[in-house]
Amino acid sequence: MSMASSTQEQYVTVATENYEATCWGCGLRLLLPSHASVFKCGWCGAITNQSKQTCDKQGLRWRRLGDRCILTIVLIFMLFLIFGGVWAVYPVVYSISFFGIFHSVITVTLAVATISSFSLSAFRCAGTPPNLVWGSYPTVANGDLENYTFCHYCSKPKSPRTHHCRSCGKCILDMDHHCPFIGNCVGADNHRSFIAFLISGLFSTIYISIVSAHAGLHVWPPLTYSIGHIHGTTSENLAWRIVKETIFAFLRSVLLLSTRGFILVYLFIASVSMMIGLSALLWQQLRFIYEGETYLSRLSSQAHNGDGNKDCQNVVRFFGFPYSVQRFLPKFLATQKKRHIKGNTHDL
């Protein structure tokens, strides 16, 4: 009798542990074996996270204000590099007729390319997820919301390729990262514009550094040396005196620099610094594109399983080129590539 009562109590305990939960994707009621904060619907495939998430509207307001301030500073700095650079190098670079026309064409081309790509990256929507029908069982078919989650901030479905940006306050499709310098996210709709901005900005900074260095050498005051008598001095002392006098002569010439000269020095230092930063960022972005990943996917745990398809086709697909790379390769190279792929398949 005691064994029967204990068995009945066990069944009652199991029954009371089961609880009902509603799937946000299709609206079906699910019977879960235990209280779980995260579960997946067997019909539509949607993932439900019942943990409470709050939206910090005050923090969102301050983040947007900070992004706009940084964006304004970047715009002013870019305009200063363009117009200030033209004014500083004008007597040396643009005064000669042929070279003036040549450098004017290069300056206008780089300026238009950089400003336009920056504007598309900053003021264009980074990527809007597609609108889906959800919440009702008859309209949601089997597997329509596979691995979708519900964004409590936007109150709509979020695909595995979508991430919610708390700085922008919305979900971004294929989000790579939030860039404070453009005041916007880098996603599916403006990622190519962002790469174009990095490329045009890199070439612009290289051009500015070369032109400012060339103009700076022409406007720099001549160095005056006062080494004095060198008879009776050893070679080591003579070398030290020459180095020291060169440094002092350079510092004395800096005091004689005009306003144009100081601007040229600043342009050279600023352009070289930005060239280094843009080169590193462009290399990182192209490497992620080649590996078929984004910055956020690299940070996630799923990106470290080593199953990524590293191929130039990822680069071609990213830039939207309609044809395969093999179409433009010589026939024997394309054949060798196909044989190599088949060989790897047989090995697997």
Where are these regions (language model features)?
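Membrane-associated feature with strongest affinity for ZDHHC
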Residues: 1-348
